[in-house]
């Protein structure tokens, strides 16, 4: 959200899919220790939300000889965020909610149905959690979109 969309100034961690997994984790731990980052600053939790229709882009992302950066397309990222639907206890805008609102606005989706239809493009209907539908419907009902 920070690098690919400029949606906010900073993030507490970097979500990535990387290989070789253990080698990258070991190096990330060493880098984190030397820079004073929290444990888990680089994580691969996003791999649990990878769709068989895995759509990425490298547009506007820096590229290096030794590192290839890609990001999910906005549509795919919105679907992933809806699948996760992590809602913070402390703040109404915690976790995925702020990102979901940003992406819905970015994509100019006019209704909760449009959002959920988009999610269904990437994930089978029987895998989409009902909390995602309730969250998205609530955002529209509250006028946050």
Located regions from the model:
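Compositionally biased terminal segments of proteins
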Residues: 1-145
